[in-house]
């Protein structure tokens, strides 16, 4: 079978990338972790099956690291820190450039793995593969502009790297989180131990190979794939880890925060969300509804920033529902390799069952289905697919309006006036992201200023990598991206005295 040619890629021959992956290996055995600049066999001996969520077939197996492997990785990072922390900006910028080029060169391979192992639809999968390299480029720009020394009165303030950073990443955008957290840590002068999700081992292998090819000093970064209760717990409690950065559920984030408190680790947590989408009464529904549905179903609903609570004016509810029903009817759920697919499978059977349970709860609590419902989409017999689902007549005390579902299930709530819309939006434990849509940008920004969320998107779904990202309330602690993300790995030291 021939390799993909440039012309084939330019003609959007999507199948070619997947054919190359299949040719290389149908069943992958991943039996190495990365410690001290080398691929090594884990001390742990547990084997974990990897599934294609679109077919429910086993596509690989990974040998998991254990607590001893985590300790070895932490020791390697600790040994590397004294030398690496003294490197200059230019040296670290050059490293980030090499990392960017190496990950970029793996884009097609990573894209295919994301679609096969995670089930991301092709458009989302391509963005995720590109994001893995672009975050390295963004970190390079931030580092280039950053001043590590500044004045405060008579004092010199030096921003100093914290030490060994433990980076714990989720399964819903494995490569991007690995590269993004690592880029910020290295830019600051920290060394790192990364624990990716065991469900993303194929993607992790590709990223690890790319980062190895970038030629960083041994021990500067280490990647140990294992379970949270073993590897994650060791990283969270080890006295030689100075910094923790975790993305995942609020429940696990609280556990990590408690574990790190014993040694007063600096902690960044990017946790769950229940993002409101406020549609103001002057909004053009023809423009807004497609954006609202995209916000809710992004990443097949498996996104902490998904806009899952849609707030609409009571007097326009019927009009909004009709437009939503039409939009969801044309939202294809199914084979992630099909360019027309917008919603792929849930990552696992456990996640599929979780989403089905919430759909049943919504019906039991009196919400009214206007699209979707339980079970798989019509014509789909296998795979962990969910019917894109929208409930109306939802009140903010219902379970589906309060708990993070992490699937393509949206709730429509109504409000009488703007003050009530804001009150409903803020009546949640979460505060990660919010969306406001209005024909009047000034009015939308006024509403945005009153929302309790780390990010508010006004009349857009666009991402800004230079802006801080993180949550209010139980959506997290600290910020990632841009200068804020860099400084999460730095500690200010004041130096006073006569020169």
Question: Predicted regions span which residues?
Answer:
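Short, often N-terminal, low-complexity regions
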Residues: 1-3, 8-11
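Short, well-ordered beta-strand elements within core beta-sheets of diverse protein domains
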Residues: 59-65, 80-86, 166-167, 277-279, ...
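Structural signal for hydrophobic packing residues in well-ordered secondary-structure cores
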Residues: 81, 85, 100-107, 111, ...
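ALDH superfamily catalytic-core signature
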Residues: 251-394, 458
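Residue-level signal for inorganic ion chemistry
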Residues: 56, 77, 92, 114, ...
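N-terminal Rossmann-like NAD(P)+-binding subdomain of aldehyde/semialdehyde dehydrogenases
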Residues: 9, 16, 20-153, 347
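Rossmann-like NAD(P) dinucleotide-binding subdomain of oxidoreductase/dehydrogenase enzymes
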Residues: 148-287, 415
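Conserved C-terminal structural/oligomerization subdomain of aldehyde/semialdehyde dehydrogenase
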Residues: 55-61, 241, 278, 332, ...
């Amino acid at each position: 079978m021939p390799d993909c040619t440039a012309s084939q890629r330019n003609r959007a021959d999507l199948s070619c990338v997947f054919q190359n992956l299949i040719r290389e290996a149908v069943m992958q055995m991943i039996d190495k972790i990365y410690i001290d600049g080398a691929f090594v066999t884990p001390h742990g001996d547990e084997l974990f099956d990897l599934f294609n969520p679109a077919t429910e077939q086993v596509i690989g197996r990974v040998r998991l690291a254990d607590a001893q492997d985590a300790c070895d990785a932490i020791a390697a990072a600790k040994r590397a820190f004294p030398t690496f922390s003294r490197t200059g900006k230019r040296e670290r910028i050059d490293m980030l450039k090499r990392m960017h080029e190496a990950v970029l060169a793996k884009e097609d391979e990573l894209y295919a793995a994301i679609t096969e192992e995670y089930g991301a639809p092709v458009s989302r999968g391509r963005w995720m593969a590109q994001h893995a390299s672009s975050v390295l480029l963004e970190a390079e720009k931030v580092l280039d502009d950053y001043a590590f020394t500044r004045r405060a009165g008579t004092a010199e303030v030096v921003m100093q790297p914290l030490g060994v950073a433990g980076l714990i990443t989720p399964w819903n955008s494995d490569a991007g989180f690995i590269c993004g957290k690592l880029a910020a840590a290295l830019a600051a002068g920290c060394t790192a131990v990364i624990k990716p999700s065991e469900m993303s081992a194929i993607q992790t292998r590709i990223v690890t190979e790319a980062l190895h090819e970038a030629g960083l000093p041994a021990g500067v970064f280490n990647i140990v794939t294992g379970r949270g209760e073993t590897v994650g717990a060791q990283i969270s409690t080890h006295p030689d880890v100075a910094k923790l950065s975790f993305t995942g559920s609020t429940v696990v984030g609280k556990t990590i925060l408690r574990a790190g408190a014993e040694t007063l680790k600096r902690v960044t947590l990017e946790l769950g969300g229940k993002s409101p989408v406020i549609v103001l009464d002057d909004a053009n529904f023809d423009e807004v509804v497609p954006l609202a549905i995209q916000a809710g179903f992004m990443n097949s609903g498996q996104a902490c920033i998904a806009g899952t609570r849609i707030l609409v004016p009571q007097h326009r509810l019927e009009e909004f529902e009709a437009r939503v029903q039409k939009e969801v009817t044309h939202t294809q759920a199914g084979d992630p390799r099909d360019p027309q697919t917008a919603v792929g499978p849930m990552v696992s059977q456990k996640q599929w069952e979780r989403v089905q349970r919430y759909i049943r709860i919504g019906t039991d609590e009196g919400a009214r289905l206007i699209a979707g419902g339980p079970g798989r989409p019509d014509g789909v017999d296998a795979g962990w697919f969910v019917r894109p689902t929208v409930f109306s007549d939802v009140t903010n005390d219902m379970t589906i309006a309060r708990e993070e579902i992490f699937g393509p299930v949206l709730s429509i709530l109504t409000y009488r006036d703007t003050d009530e819309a804001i009150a409903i939006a803020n009546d949640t434990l979460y505060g990660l992201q919010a969306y406001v849509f209005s024909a009047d940008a000034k009015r939308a920004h006024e509403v945005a200023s009153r929302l309790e969320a780390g990010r508010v998107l006004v009349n857009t779904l666009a991402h800004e990598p230079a802006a801080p990202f993180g949550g209010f309330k139980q959506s997290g602690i600290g910020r990632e991206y841009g200068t804020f993300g860099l400084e999460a790995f730095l500690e200010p030291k004041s130096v006073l005295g006569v020169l």
